[in-house]
């Protein structure tokens, strides 16, 4: 009975380690001393969309792309992208530490953007936040959002290398 339980536990540990190793192998990783820096979604020649360091996930600024000319729709689409990035990094909005929001027209769009934000944010784990008006990279963009979050746990703690 104990051998079976131990074998099953060992098998699960090996499967988890293999999965993590496969994920880690496809990430661009650099090491400085004992501090690992993991970069995900590095296809863009200018930036990574996700950087993980010391248990903190940094996302690049996200925009809605072609979500129309309504700030609510753009905010919803942008936050969906943020959710996807956080999930890929191994965390979620409930671990968000800070958010920066840029609006093309803060006087016109602040209230509507906040309605969507309030529906999205975890009410028990609200991050610090700043919202400012900014010239956007493309005329169609009304909102851009960048989120920094804590990891659920250290992704390297179970790996032996």
Question: Which residues does each predicted region cover?
Answer:
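N-terminal presequence-like segments and the immediate start of the first folded domain
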Residues: 4-6, 10-97, 103-161
